[in-house]
Amino acid sequence: MKTFDSQAENSPAVIGRSLRNRPLARKKLSEMVEEELEQMIRRKEFGEGEQLPSERELMAFFNVGRPSVREALAALKRKGLVQINNGERARVSRPSADTIIGELSGMAKDFLAHPGGIAHFEQLRLFFESSLVRYAAENATDAQIDLLAKALEINSQSLDDNALFIRSDVDFHRVLAEIPGNPIFKAIHVALLDWLIAARPTVPDRELYEHNSVSYQQHIAIVDAIRQRDPDAADRALQTHLNSVSATWHALGQQSKRKK
C-alpha cells in the first residue's frame, strides 16, 4: 500500500500537473466588453452624464455582435454605472445607495425563503432600528420630530384601511431612518421592509384591524420617548413594537398554514 506523502502532494510539479488538468473557464465576450467599458468609465474616459457610443459603434470597436454589447450594457446598468432609456444611447451615471442595495435583492429574497430566514431578517431590523431610535432621541431636530408626528397622524387616519395603514406604517419608520441623514441607512431600511413585507402571509383584512391599533399605540410610545430625549425609553418602546409585530405575523402565518 502506498503511503501518503504530503510534501510530494504539495510539490510544485504535482500542483502544476493538477492545474493543467483544470482549464480555466473562458470569459464570455459580453463580460469582456463589460469589464473594458467599466474601466473606461472609471478612468473618466466617459464622464458622468455623457452618452456612450451607439450599439453599432461599440460592436465595431470591440468586434463583437449586438447581443454581447447589450448584455454588457445591461450588466453596467445593474451596477448603476449607466442609465438606459428606450431609443437613446446609454448614459454614464453614478451608482447610488439604492443601486448597491438593489444588487442584494435577489439573494435576500432567497435567504428569506430558507428556514429561519424571516426571523434572521427581523432580528437585523431590530438591531438596525434600535440604533436609529436611540440616535433620534439624542439628535433629532424639532423639525424632524414634527415630521415623525405628521407620519403618526397619517397612521392614525388609516386604522380601518389595511393597505393605507401598511403604507403609513412604512412611512413612519422611513422618517426614523432619514433622521441621521445617511442615504445608505435609508436605502437599507427601504429594502429591508420591502423584503419583509413581501415575505408576509396573505391574511383577511378583518384579522389585521386589531393589529393596526396596537401598532399605532406603540408608535405613539416611540415618538413620546424621542420627544423626551430618552434614548433608553425610545429603544424599549421600539423593541416592544417590533417584537409585537414579529409575534403577530408569526401567529397569522401559522393560522394561514392550518387553514390550507
From Swiss-Prot:
Disulfide bonds: none annotated. Belongs to the NanR family. Transcriptional repressor that controls expression of the genes required for the catabolism of sialic acids. Gene3D superfamilies: GntR ligand-binding domain-like (1.20.120.530), Winged helix-like DNA-binding domain superfamily/Winged helix DNA-binding domain (1.10.10.10). This is HTH-type transcriptional repressor NanR. GO terms for biological process: negative regulation of DNA-templated transcription. InterPro entries: GntR_C, TF_FadR/GntR_C, Tscrpt_reg_HTH_GntR, Tscrpt_reg_NanR, WH-like_DNA-bd_sf, WH_DNA-bd_sf.
